[in-house]
Each structure stands twice: as structure tokens, then as C-alpha cells.
Amino acid sequence: MLEQIRGPADLQHLSTHQLRELAAEIREFLIHKVAATGGHLGPNLGVVELTLALHRVFDSPHDPIIFDTGHQAYVHKMLTGRAHEFESLRKKGGLSGYPSRSESEHDWVESSHASAALSYADGLAKAFELSGHRNRHVVAVVGDGALTGGMCWEALNNIAASGRPVIIVVNDNGRSYAPTIGGVADHLATLRLQPAYEQALQRGRDALRALPLVGKFAYRVMHSVKAGIKDSLSPQLLFTDLGLKYVGPVDGHDERAVEAALRHARGFGRPVIVHVVTRKGMGYAPAEDDEADQMHSCGVIDPITGQATKVAGPGWTATFSDALIGYARKRRDIVAITAAMPGPTGLTPFGQQFPDRLFDVGIAEQHAMTSAAGLAMGGMHPVVAIYSTFLNRAFDQIMMDVALHRLPVTMVLDRAGITGSDGASHNGMWDLSILGVVPGMRVAAPRDAARLREELGEALDVDDGPTALRFPKGDVGEDIPAIERRGSGLSGVDVLALPASGCNHDVLLIGVGAFAPMALAVARRLADQGIGVTVVDPRWVLPVSDSILELAARHKLVVTCEDNGVNGGVGSAVSAALRRAELDVPCRDVGLPQRFYEHASRGELLADLALTDQDIARRITGWVAALGSGVAEAEIREHLD
């Protein structure tokens, strides 16, 4: 049946029995396709009936359907003509794991970061009204914990006051990655409002107000009594007191019930909350039985057992997790904060060991950072573990609430650099540029597991300002020993390789963090061409160590190699430091060009960007040749470009 669905119009004449058959087929399709490619399985298994109902009630794309945390949009993609592309899900040149404007007119936004859909919906509703398109509805589907984000409540405040026809579907599965935390999660409860009930209620209000002399007074008295009763009985007042209509809760796996609720909501002609209760991982036993996160996201798995087909090696996240627990056993002041991601950021074991020292604040990165500031003011040393890409959301709090007060808060940035298959929104290529402008910020980029443990310990010993550690997704690899360390403390840099015997000190190659192994491979290639290279790991990459400047003064060329955007990264910082020190040594930066990157594997993206050891060695060879020929600096720059 799924093969016959080319678009939402093909759903309109299906019977209840056919819809049930289609839902079962969609789940089977999802399990086998996502098992083969990896992706967000649990969230999509939970929204099958909801998505069918949405596309039967609303006229997409005329009525925009916006998915917050867009990882729950797989079924939407299938129903809008893209089921045949799922073999390529999250692969280079294939189907994105999130809504994509370039794929379909049904995808209005590139949504993947949480809590933004309601603001998009508010803006679209305003635009439609100003354009005279009063017969268009805007639907925002929020869930997977998105309502724990403050941006949702800012948008709700505006939507409620507008009176515009925005339908807000709350996909209440009680979870983000792990179970949803906080008062909002506790507050999603019951009230079933039907249009007929609302119409009768309004007629009663009008009749009461019309009574001679006492009408308005009687209405106020009765309204106060009704409000008091509702306050004691109806948790949904969280929404209705904002001026939003409320429908629900509705069984999210009863397609007809969801469809009826959506049709009622559409008929109100004003902002409405439709509360839909779903089960993450619905219909797939391995997901339903996964207490950690209902298989929120998975790699390639066996579709029968749900088990990974490839055993991963030691990972960066697990290494951090073990190290933090080790330090926390020795120091009671160490606490940890997560923004709804204890599992993905490695904090679940910490919470099991120290349940009173782990704080899950929900999808609320801004609050996480300022709460960390408060903890630090109170004598704790908070560790905020967060994906690099989500750090962007808390910049003001880092600057004004943490750094301004010189508070000892440590930020651990997982998934730094190119992450790959999750696409543009998840590449952690901005953190060095962002943190580089924060006064007093110190940033480390460990090259291996041993350095991660060491640099985490150093960060925890800092008591006069914020620190950050960044590391990529995936396996951590073998430890890389240093030949020597120049300098001490946070200023100490590790020398990993020296020029071969008989070679000049031509190039100082600075390998930042996980790019250190590639820097060593580049040095070996250059040595074969008679180019002498010193490879250093700066360890604490920001601010630039005096030891780096001392080494730079002994070389003809400095090259930085980093897994970050080149604008404002380590290369920019080293160039600026060389100028301040009045060192006339040219510096070239190798990193990520400043643009958004489509989904592909990390290796594929790095190859496309000429960020392999072979490509980098070729570029450095050209730079050294240009320097050796005595060409003017401007001509060298032109040659390099």
C-alpha cells in the first residue's frame, strides 16, 4: 500500500481498515530501512498515526506542517513522495535525516534544533495574515521534550495573544532522549474540549451577561467560581490561562481519534493546543524495551534483534564519562549538568554514581549555563556536557553570566568538528570561533584519551574563570606520546615530531585536537620531500601559548590544522598572536571553509574539503616552494588561494 502513496492526496479516500494496514506497513518499512542506514528510529515509530492524521486533515504544503526536533519527520517524508529514497537516508547525496527545503515543498524549515517550531509558526501565521491568506492554517508539531525549552514559551506567549489560526500539536511521549524532566512534563494532563462544548459555553456567557442589572456581576461571580474549580481539577490551565484552546489528551495511536481532534482544532479558527499522547518506539519490541531512550537514535542494527551489527571501539564520550567519575570520587564539589541528553553526552553513569550531583535541566541550554554559574558561585565546580552545535544557543549566558563573573564552569563539548550524517545543523564547527571572543576563556582540544583525562583534570583545577574541552564524535584511537613538553601547566605544548636528520626547520605544523594524527601523517609525507616539519599539539588551544610563539620564531612557516571553521579559529588566533609579538613568520590555516555542509560521512566530507593528509601535504609543499622562491607575500597569498 505504501508504494501507492505519492503524496498526501492519496490518503484522503482510505478506510479505517486501510489506514491501520498502512500504519503497520510504515512501521515495518521504518524498522528495516533505518536498521540499514542508522537514524532516529524510536521517535518516528511513535508518530505514525499522528502524521497520517496531519496529512489527512491539513492541506500540505498550503497549510505548513512544521516539525520541531525534525528527526521525527521520517513518516512525513514517506507520505510526501520520498519513500523510494530511504535507501539513501543520511548518506552523501541522499535523503536528509531532517526536513530539507531542497528536497520537498512540504518541508518548510530545516528543523533539527529543538523548541524553534512555534516561532516559525508564529511568523508564518503573521505573514499569511498580512498577505490576505486567511484560509491557511499553520501546524507546529512539538515533542520529544521540546516544551522544556524556553523559546517555546516565548512563542506561546505571542501566539496566544495573536488569535491567529496556529495549531500546536504536542506529541507527548514523555521523553526527549531520556525521560522528559521538569514541571512542564508533569503538567501535561487532561481536559477534553469539543467545539460544541465551547459553543454552548459561549451561549451561556452571552445569556448571563444579558440579564438586566445583575448580568455582568453574575457573570463575574460564576466565572470566578468556575475558574476556582478548574484550577483545582485541570492541569491544562497551563495553556488555557495563556488564552490557548486545549484539546486532549488524545490517544496518539488511534488515527481516527487524532484526526477528529485535529478537525475540531482546525474549526476553532484561533490558536489551539492538541495534546496527543504517543509511545516512543511503538510497535518495535527492541525499542519499546529500551529503557534508556527507546532507541532514539541508532547506528546500523539487526532489524530483528535491534542490536548493533558493528561493535564500536573506545569512544571519546565514554572516555570523558569514566574520567569525570574518577575525579568526582575525589572531589565532592564536582557536579554535572545536561540539557536533556545524559546518555549521548556520557553523563548517565555519573548520575548512577552520584544521583544528587547530576542536574538534567531539559532542552534549556541557556538556563543550563546560568544555573551552572549559580552553582559555581555557591562553591561547586559544574561540568556542563553539551553537543558543540548546541553551545551556540547559550552564548550570551557564557559571556555575561559565567565569564563576566570569572566563574569556574567547565564546558565539555561533544561532537566537535565535522560530525557527518546528521548534516549542517549538527556539525560542531563554530565553538572555537565563539569561545575565542570570550574574555578569560581557556579551551582545550585533546588529541587522545590520555590527554582528555589530563586536560579535564586541569580544567577542574581552574578556579578563576571558565574552561572548555572539545572532542569529536566516534572512536578515540590510540594514544600519541609526546617527544617533549614545552612550557608548564595550561601553557605547556606537546612536541609530537621533529624535523628529520639533515632537514631544516621549515614548517611548524600545529595539529589541533583530533587532527593531531593527521598532522603527523602530513609531516611524514613532507619529510619524504626533504621538508623539515615540527609537529606540536597545543593542548590548550586558546589562548595561544607563549611556547607556540617561541617555536614559531624558529621556523619559516606556521600552519594550523583544525576541525573548526577557519574564520575565528585557532589559525586566526595564532596569526593575531604572531602579529602582536611582532614575529615576521607567515601563518596559514587549514580548516573548514565557512559554510553549511550537507550530510555525508565524516571521511567523505573531509575528502571533499581536501582535508586529508595527502591534500594538506600538497598545499604545504606549494607554500614552502613559494616562500623559497622569494616571491612577495601578496603573490604567495594569491598562489595559495
Curated annotation (Swiss-Prot):
Binding, thiamine diphosphate: H71, S112, H113, A114, G145, A146, N173, Y284, E365
Cofactor: Mg(2+); thiamine diphosphate
SMART domains noted in UniProt: Transket_pyr (SM00861)
Pfam families found in the cross-reference section: DXP_synthase_N, Transket_pyr, Transketolase_C
GO BP annotation list: 1-deoxy-D-xylulose 5-phosphate biosynthetic process; isopentenyl diphosphate biosynthetic process, methylerythritol 4-phosphate pathway; terpenoid biosynthetic process; thiamine biosynthetic process
The keyword Metal-binding is assigned to this record: yes
Binding partners and assembly: Homodimer.
Reported function: Catalyzes the acyloin condensation reaction between C atoms 2 and 3 of pyruvate and glyceraldehyde 3-phosphate to yield 1-deoxy-D-xylulose-5-phosphate (DXP).
PANTHER family named among the record's database cross-references: 1-D-DEOXYXYLULOSE 5-PHOSPHATE SYNTHASE-RELATED, 1-DEOXY-D-XYLULOSE-5-PHOSPHATE SYNTHASE, CHLOROPLASTIC
Protein name: 1-deoxy-D-xylulose-5-phosphate synthase
Species of origin: Mycobacterium avium (strain 104)
Gene expressing this chain: dxs
